[in-house]
Amino acid sequence: RVSVELEGNLLSDRFGKYASEADRLEGFPVRSFPIHIEEVPEGSVSLALAFIDFDAIPVGGFCWIHWLACDFDPSTTLIPEDASRTGAIACTQGANSNWSPMAHGSLNPA
């Protein structure tokens, strides 16, 4: 089971378009939110995540990939805030939509 803390059924502003400049790269928000993990099936070898935004299709014309990551230890119970940038927890990260020239022309993986 995976859960994230919400404020009024939404992620905190610091993780989205209202993020501070310190949490932006090339104008885009890049701070990942904390993810709580429970009840991982016994015998699991690793964990993976895909944070994909289907609501972006009408705006950008394609599904926005915010974060892809794998090889989390199956005993992980918390992926801490900003782990995508800080490397606070061991994992292998994939390319997100910031790498796509269809997004905004940047090749920075954020």
Give the residues covered by each predicted segment.
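N-terminus-centered regions that define maturation/targeting leaders and the start
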Residues: 1-110
